[in-house]
From Swiss-Prot:
Entry protein name: tRNA (pseudouridine(54)-N(1))-methyltransferase
GO biological process, one term: tRNA methylation
Keywords attached to this entry: Cytoplasm, Methyltransferase, S-adenosyl-L-methionine, Transferase, tRNA processing
CDD domains reported in the protein's UniProt record: TrmY-like
Subcellular location: Cytoplasm
Length: 288
């Protein structure tokens, strides 16, 4: 970079935009700034960065944060509450994601008259409904990922995008109909569009969460995690939630390799759909 003591907003296919110049390097002259907005195909998404060495202030009436990250050090999120507002001020889209792991959820079309008998498909449907729907509307900034690991041909992953999905209603049967239709489509490792806002692939847990970690800050919801009331949440959070049985030890190890934070919503073990509602409630109050 032209000035190693400056923080920049970096956009794909766009010139560098200097925010401000630091008077002194925060992590030494040999380290480059790591404060960047990356712009994937559609939405500008914030890359997690090191929040322990940063400044906050005002420039042209806007809140800004600055920081540098040693090249050898893993990126972490900033603990600055101004980041979501900063991100929106420069045209970014702060999004939310939910990954629901269904260890026994069927991976072939199933009967809509027996959702619990389809590997507790009812749990995944309720989580999807609570993640996407509000009164008389849908959350356009939410993506739901369903990982189905039941018989007969696991794994299968289903993606539902709030800003694209059509003709979906909050009831379990309707959501299940969209999932059933997705399972009837032949697919490979790449996402294949089923219809508006619904995609399917054969990604397993590690492939899926590695892909999601490029776009989201992964948060694993677990009773023994950091209390949500004391936690500083990263931008673009994606919450990983187990089904009625939770995650296996092996799955937990995979998730924890990519997780920025292990978060507790309650000391009690909650229903999966309750976790979705509480996470939304907390982010709504923070105006994420």
């Amino acid at each position: 970079m032209e000035n190693p003591d400056s923080a920049f907003l970096l956009f794909r296919n766009a010139p560098r935009l200097p925010l401000a110049t630091m008077h002194t390097p925060l992590c030494g002259d040999s380290h480059q700034p790591d404060f960047a907005f990356r712009k994937p195909a559609r939405d500008a998404l914030l890359r997690p960065w090191n929040g322990r060495n940063h400044r906050c202030g005002l420039q042209d009436g806007r809140e800004i944060c600055q920081g540098q990250l040693p090249a050898h050090q893993k990126s972490y999120w900033s603990d600055c509450a101004a980041l979501p507002r900063l991100f929106r001020a420069y045209g970014g889209a702060v999004v939310r994601g939910f990954l629901i792991v269904g260890n026994k959820a069927f991976t072939q079309p199933f009967s809509l008259n027996d959702l619990p008998g389809a590997g507790r498909m009812d749990v995944l449907c309720r989580c999807t409904s609570q993640a996407l729907f509000i009164s008389h509307g849908i959350r356009r900034d939410v993506e739901v990922y369903l990982l189905l690991l039941g018989p007969p041909s696991p794994p299968k992953s289903i993606l539902i995008k709030g800003d694209e999905v059509r003709r979906m209603s909050p009831d379990e049967r309707n959501v299940a109909g969209h999932i059933k239709k997705a399972l009837a489509v032949e697919c490979g490792k790449s996402w294949k569009k089923v219809h508006s806002g619904v995609y399917v692939s054969r990604k397993g847990l590690e492939e899926l969460i590695e892909e999601l970690s490029e776009k989201y800050s992964i948060i694993y919801l677990k009773e023994d995690g950091v209390d949500i009331s004391n936690a500083q949440l990263p931008p673009n959070p994606l919450f990983v939630i187990g089904d009625h049985e939770g995650l296996t030890e092996e799955q937990e190890k995979v998730v924890e390799r990519y997780a920025a934070l292990k978060l507790s919503l309650s000391p009690l073990s909650l229903l999966a759909e309750q976790c979705v509602v509480i996470a939304h409630h907390h982010l709504d109050r923070l105006q994420f």
